Each structure stands twice: as C-alpha cells, then as structure tokens.
C-alpha cells in the first residue's frame, strides 16, 4: 500500500542508557554503539547499533514529560517504536490517511536529510510506527 521496503530501526525505551548499553552490547557482540546522538527536539539520547541493515536503538529521555519518559512511566521499559522505510513519506501519509490509518503527523517531520512521520500507537497494537524516507 505505501511501499514499505524494510525495517529501518527498532527503538527500545530505557531508563538508564549506560546500563542498558552494557547489557545489550554483550548480547549484540559490540564494544560500543555504531552511532550515538542526542535529539533535543524529541528529548532523547540514543545509542544505535546496526544488526545487518537494521538499526537497533536504545533510547532514554533527556527531559521530564517527553514521549519516552511518558512511555516508560505508563508501560515500563521495552519496545516503543518500529520504523519502516518507504519511498516517499509525503505520499505515504496521504495514502495512510485515505485508508483511515490514524496519524500523529499530518505533515512529515524533518531530521537531517530525512522526512518521517508517526502513526498513532493505539490502533497499531500499542506500537508507535514510524515511516521514514529511504525505501527504493
């Protein structure tokens, strides 16, 4: 329907990022994240590991009341988000709206050189679904 080509990344919400990193790095066979960053607008600190072509992200809140903070307070730590690559986020949003999917974003958000948008989690079995440019 929207041309999903692959999973881009999966996000795990954690309270204590350094502790979670130590735990997961051992399992993943990694000495350190492939990428670390802070996204001030989303109020998250992220450690990303690549497993094949898929990003596996551990993320913690950098601000009280952020989406990650609220998620952990409501549900505890765990899988928060699955992101799918699509050829064109703008047209995917239009198609999803036409097919009665509940969107958080009516217009794409932009980070670095990518457009992305979120679907509401409740109708998606409690999972926050992200669509992001990059699928060809």
Model-identified regions with their sequence ranges:
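Long, hydrophobic N-terminal alpha-helical segment
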Residues: 1-42
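A short, acidic/glycine-rich surface segment
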Residues: 33-36, 65-70
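A structural feature that tracks compact, well-ordered secondary-structure segments
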Residues: 11-15, 23, 54-61, 70, ...
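Residues at alpha-helix termini
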Residues: 26-27, 74, 98
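Short solvent-exposed loop/turn micro-motifs enriched in small/polar/acidic residues
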Residues: 40-42, 64, 111-112
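Vicinal oxygen chelate
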Residues: 1-3, 7-15, 36, 47-50, 57, 70-90, 117, ...
